[in-house]
Structures are given as C-alpha cells and as structure tokens.
C-alpha cells in the first residue's frame, strides 16, 4: 500500500469508527452488556451473555461467512460458535434455542463486511472482558473462557489482518457507505437481540 492508499484507508476506518460510535455505546450500556464487566458478575449472567453471543455468531457463520468463502483466507479460523458451546458445556449450561439476529435479506458483500467488522471487533473487546471474568473462581485458568480468549496472543494480529482486508476491499470497490451501513445495522441488531431476551 502506498502512502496515499494508507491515508485513504485510515480515513475510511476513522469514519467507520466515528459513524458507529453511538450504536456501539448504546449496546455497551445495556444491563446485560454491563453485567459481564461488573466486579460482582454472576455465572448466570455470564451464561446468559454467552447464549446471546452464541446467536450472534451462529447467525454470522450461517449468513455472513459464506459470502467470504475464497475472499478471506483465515475465515475458518474466525469461527467462534464452538468456543461458546464449549464454555457453556464447561459451566453445565444449555445452549438456548437459536434466534436469528440479523433479520435482513440479500446481504451484499460490503454490507456483510460491516457486520463482520462488529463481530470481529467484539473478539478484540473480549480480551478486555476476559480480565474481568477471569476473576471469578469458577472461570479462572482457561476453563469456561475460551470465547473471550479469542485468538489468544494472536488476537491483535487477527484484528489488524481483518482491518487490512476491509480497507483494501473498500478502496477497490468504493463501498464505504455500505460497509458503514452494515456495521450500524449489526450494532443495532445485536442491541435489539440483547434487549428482547
């Protein structure tokens, strides 16, 4: 990438972050979101959050991932539904019945990239959440926290790799508005899902 391309990519990523900030903040302020950052977090709250995120990842893997087959080299490594299932199993909690989160049809690749931006961003944020949930004795060590562990010590590099792919795709296809629209849609859809359950 030359300097001009890097500037354009940085500008787009800044716009994406800025234009999704309100939706992101609104989601983080929901009681269920705040519960997992509480020093008094209960295992029941943790399991509820995991079940909600299971729906998010199940829908992403079913609806969004197929659009990136052959485009995103490390797509299979980005699956997280099984990590949530392993954590819930460790806690002797059932996976609740699946509920669709992203209720829309005919998702374009740019729109889907916006959704994936939010879902991948949650993995990066999960590393911060991990610090809190790991304080619960039942979750200490590596048991019950595989979802929030994300990609382990490679989480940062996976995020950078995704942002590079996102930026290059946006530059080549001039589709920033659709990506931003997809990201806002994802934050709002997850918010509605969390609030309804």
State the predicted function of each range:
Residues 1-197:
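Metal- and O2-centered redox machinery and metal/ROS homeostasis
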